[in-house]
Design a protein with these regions (language model features):
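Positively charged, small/polar-rich N-terminal and surface patches that mediate targeting and assembly
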Residues: 1-107
Length: 107
């Protein structure tokens, strides 16, 4: 049986996150995308310390779609190197699993 998978990413702003999220949900690659605007980031980029405003994103999908979700994010994302972190939950509520798997059929 497939396992649930959370994908953490960031977007330059709320609208970009919602637009990419809607495309991923419509393609049945993810069941849901949560986007939190107003995040402040400090990060190292090409040898410099940068600051910026971003929106955090948390995607809910199944592990079997990992590579397709990653490819779709990279293709749609405006960042040169988008952050894509896979988080494997140790468990989930049965109803939550049924919902995620029902919304993201094996492809």
């Amino acid at each position: 049986m497939d396992r649930p998978l959370l994908v953490y990413t960031t977007f330059p702003d709320l609208d970009t996150g919602l637009s990419i999220g809607e495309a991923l949900v419509s393609a049945k690659l993810v069941a849901c995308v949560n986007v939190w605007p107003g995040m402040r980031s400090v990060y190292s980029w090409k040898g410099d310390v940068e600051r910026g405003s971003e929106a955090a994103g948390l995607l809910k999908t199944r592990a079997g779609l990992r590579e397709r979700v990653s490819a779709a994010l990279k293709s749609a994302h405006p960042y040169e190197t988008p952050i894509i972190l896979f988080i494997e939950p140790s468990g989930a509520d049965d109803a939550t699993l049924a919902w995620i798997f029902g919304e993201t059929p094996d492809q």
